[in-house]
Amino acid sequence: DKGKDILMSILLLAMMLPFVAIMIPLFKMFTSWKLVNTWIALALHSISTPFMIMLFRQAARSFPHDIIEAARLEGLSEIQIFFRMFIPVMKSTYGAAMTVTFMNAWNNYLWPTIILQDNKAITMPMLVANLKSGYSVDYGMLMLGVLICTLPTAIIFLCLQKSFANGITGAVK
């Protein structure tokens, strides 16, 4: 248990590391995997962040051990306990993780600028940044771009609002 706490402390220290500090090694890794200019490279770095690991760890620690013991007494295997009991109870945590991951990936500007080197594929924040480049700025078009860029995030948050709130607070039903 002490080793797990040390590992978690190292993980929490990784949360303090700015993305710019790990951007070049990440780019080299994705280049060696031949994932530059792919949508996989955009999503892959957002999935396993230290925050997500901490969120799921805390939610798993709050899972009642009495339920697990009762399931073992009923004869369920560890896999059955995981799929029949753990995952359904953790739906709110999964909802919160999906919301945060989508918001981070959708609103990210720096990583797509680095990893998408072809002008054929750009993200919405990159498109909005392109709208304001030049000598004259059409603010109406720029605000429309910002609104369109914001809509998917707002819709997903509103749809998963209850799951997001329960998952962040660690509510277990």
Regions found by a protein language model. Give the residues of each.
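A structural signal for multi-pass alpha-helical bundles of membrane permease subunits
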Residues: D1-K173
